[in-house]
Amino acid sequence: YIELPDEKKLAEIRDIPHGTLTHEFYKSEISNNWERFIVYLPPCVPSAGLPVLYLQHGFGESEISWTTTGKANIILDNLIEMGKIKPFALVMSDGMVQEKVGSEERLNHVLLERMLVEEIIPMAEKKYQFGGCKEKRGMAGLSMGSVQTTRTICDHPDLFSEVGIFSGFIRDNIEGNPDRDAVGRKPYEQTHLKAMDDPDFNNYFHTFFRCIGDNDCFLSRFLEEDAIIQEKGVHEIRKIYPGGHDWNVWRPCFTDFAQMIFR
């Protein structure tokens, strides 16, 4: 791809201290496969005690997407240097989870929720000593990652205090979709949304950020979900960006969200 200049230069590498990226590999008992995630640690501070954001990519991508095309680590380095945010860590997992079914492997995006809660969060937080409690933990994702985020935070509101839904969906448009769900399940009944009926739902989260591009191919679905958000009385920060279903929207989404959380 061609690297175009960034107007605010937040996604461009500058001569400042930079954080580190570490690739972690583990054998998952849930997917029965070797899995991986990337950990970003900010520069010049110990990892112990830091807040951590669990950040998910979209359909067809992988755990490297947020730091290659997304430039998330560069954006955070620059925001930290500018004093716009307090340092926090990132954990970026492969959300295209492949489940072994006989001799074949099939996509099962739903497994990520269990893998995060039962394997990735305990493993990462034990090793790096960040997070450790709801107040120091958030989750965000783009497109498919927004589906995984919404399902996870609705099922486990006790684990996260910050939520980012980029080009995002609160309904799962993958499970049971013959074009996307390789597992071949029946359409999902969106049972996770019942969590939003809890009178205390808004008290669970400091930030509930939902956004999309004004030329996104899924904009109509996003607007439909406005009504669900309003009906359930969810307190959200909502923003429409110029652009489509691509990184020209997701980088600004992430940049803005990073300045809202862990304050």
Feature locations, PLM:
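Non-catalytic cap/lid and distal C-terminal segments of serine-dependent acyl enzymes
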Residues: 1-263
